[in-house]
């Protein structure tokens, strides 16, 4: 360049520098484009929402009470047909979702215990990976949430009307309906944080449709004119299942007439019949209670005029239960629609994983039951819908044996974070993204329920479920095995344990059960028995809690324990 005039040398140097800048900048832009955008996660969870009450699952009940907004997630994403919980009760299921570990390892086996918030959890791992985290609604693990940037939680179970919330240690009563309040909390947080460069985890967790199924004021008469079909097993005798015979969660025997069925003491009265927990109604404002009474008084007066007895009374109770339960679901579906609409209207759908699930299954009259707890299908199965347009094909169905144990590993993999070795679940990402068949995902699931003696007096039990068979052992104050062929007996009414036609299958199931207990590090400590006096005392306490209702029921001895009437109870 010595012979080139200085003017030209400067021009050439400028051109070379410009080309170098363009090249470097282009390479930087290409690198930025190659870095995948990590998805947001909107996790919506209800409490006790049965698959039978989600119309995407096609149950006859849901056809009469559809959930069009929840169904949008299934239509635009994946529906899980064989997703199960590890322990069918509120708090323990939530602990499993947070930790990816079975109850005996995360330390939260039963409602009423205190969750060890210091242990590693999904929100903590996501925060470490650069996510914002927020939780609104039902926590039910006692203590304050850890790992969340923002949170505002219901006190304990929460109340439907004018619920109390805890935020940063302060308790505040908020006027309104719990489902609407929690939905709006989630939406408000979205509006403030959706524009952030950081991805986020937002957990919107509802009380509904948990007992005692109080619909929003706008839905009090929603299904009054609808006659819902009761299950074929509504009046089953529970032959071959001692645990089913001794439970306290039969609709027509064990529901409280005031608290659960909202019945008045007599025609023309607005005073409730037996209602051991008055706070659910006492906290309503005068205006709310007036609208409530105007809706229920005509229905209750008609009931008193009918003077129903026996089977007709039992069927009426089933109808009232379903009408209230499904009307309570309606506000949840509306709330889901609001969140989906916001995400869509603000261009957030493509990069957001949307999850709809519940903490476990629930009985809607099957075997005559309400509530959950048992390892039978209605209680064991957890509805699960996941949408992520960027990666999950619309309208797919997943038939692998999955569990709430798998939620945390799945979200971590989608977020590009490492899945900790201590998590016992497996990522479901391949099932979702590549529509994998799931045959090799898991050949059996393990289940263990501990909460006895407690509400509804469902015995402690553990078991294994494969694609076709189920083996369960009820223990503590009884010792009974149950086994079912789900292909031949999907309603689980014929206990085939020790049936000679199934000897080989039974042996294989025992081997599988032993193997899973070894795999999941289950020790003898998990099978300790409750002192008999504690069990008897619990039966006595629940007899007292039932109060006047007890004296109206036949079969009192069967209900309150092992063929013996508890002491001091007449």
Model-identified regions with their sequence ranges:
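Formylglycine-dependent sulfatase
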Residues: 2-9, 16, 20, 24-475, ...
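Residues forming the ATP-binding cleft of Hanks-type serine/threonine protein kinase domains
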Residues: 487
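A contiguous, mid-protein "functional segment" used to position or interact
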Residues: 500-539
């Amino acid at each position: 360049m010595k012979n080139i005039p200085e003017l030209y040398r400067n021009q050439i140097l400028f051109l070379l520098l410009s080309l170098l800048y363009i090249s470097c900048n282009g390479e930087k832009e290409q690198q930025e484009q190659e870095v995948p955008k990590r998805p947001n996660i909107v996790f919506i969870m209800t409490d006790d929402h049965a698959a039978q009450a989600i119309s995407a699952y096609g149950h006859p009940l849901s056809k009469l009470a559809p959930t069009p907004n929840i169904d949008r997630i299934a239509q635009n994403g994946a529906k899980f047909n064989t997703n199960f919980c590890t322990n069918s009760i509120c708090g323990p299921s939530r602990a499993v979702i947070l930790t990816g570990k079975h109850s005996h390892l995360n330390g939260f086996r039963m409602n009423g215990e205190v969750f060890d918030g210091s242990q590693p959890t999904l929100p903590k791992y996501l925060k470490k990976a650069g996510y914002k985290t927020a939780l609104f609604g039902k926590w039910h693990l006692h203590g304050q949430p850890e790992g969340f940037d923002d949170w505002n939680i219901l006190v304990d179970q929460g109340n439907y009307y004018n619920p109390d919330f805890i935020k940063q240690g302060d308790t505040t009563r908020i006027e309104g309906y719990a489902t609407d309040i929690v939905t709006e909390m989630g939406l408000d947080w979205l509006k403030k944080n959706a524009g952030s460069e950081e991805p986020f985890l937002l957990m919107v967790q509802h009380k509904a449709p948990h007992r005692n199924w109080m619909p929003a004021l706008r839905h009090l008469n929603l299904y009054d004119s609808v006659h819902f079909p009761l299950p074929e097993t509504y009046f089953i005798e529970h032959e071959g299942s001692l645990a089913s015979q001794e439970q306290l969660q039969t609709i027509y025997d064990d529901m409280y007439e005031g608290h659960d069925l909202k019945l008045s003491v007599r025609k023309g009265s607005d005073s409730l019949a037996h209602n051991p927990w008055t706070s659910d109604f006492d906290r309503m404002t005068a205006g709310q209670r007036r609208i409530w009474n105007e809706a229920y008084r005509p229905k209750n007066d008609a009931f008193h005029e009918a003077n129903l007895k026996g089977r007709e009374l039992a069927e009426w109770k089933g109808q009232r239960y379903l009408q209230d339960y499904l009307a309570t679901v309606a506000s949840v579906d509306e709330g889901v629609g609001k969140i989906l609409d916001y995400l869509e209207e603000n261009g957030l759908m493509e990069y957001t994983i949307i999850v709809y699930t519940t903490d476990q299954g629930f009985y809607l009259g099957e075997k005559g039951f309400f509530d959950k707890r048992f390892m039978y299908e209605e209680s064991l199965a957890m509805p699960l819908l996941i949408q992520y347009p960027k990666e999950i094909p619309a309208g797919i169905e997943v038939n692998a044996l999955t569990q709430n144990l798998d939620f945390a590993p799945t979200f971590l993999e989608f977020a590009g974070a490492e899945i900790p070795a201590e998590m016992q679940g497996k990522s479901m990402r391949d099932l979702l993204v590549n529509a994998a068949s799931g045959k090799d995902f898991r050949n059996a699931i393990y289940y263990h329920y501990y909460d006895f003696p407690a509400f509804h007096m469902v015995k402690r039990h553990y078991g294994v479920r494969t694609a076709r068979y189920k083996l369960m052992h009820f223990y503590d104050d009884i010792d009974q095995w149950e086994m079912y062929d789900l292909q031949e007996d999907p309603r689980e009414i014929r206990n085939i344990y020790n049936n000679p036609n199934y000897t080989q299958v039974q042996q294989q199931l025992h081997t599988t059960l032993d193997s899973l207990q070894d795999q999941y590090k289950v020790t003898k400590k998990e099978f300790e028995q409750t002192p008999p006096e504690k069990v008897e005392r619990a039966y006595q306490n629940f007899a007292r809690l039932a109060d006047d209702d007890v004296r109206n029921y036949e079969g009192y001895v069967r209900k309150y324990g092992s063929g013996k009437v508890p002491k001091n109870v007449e």
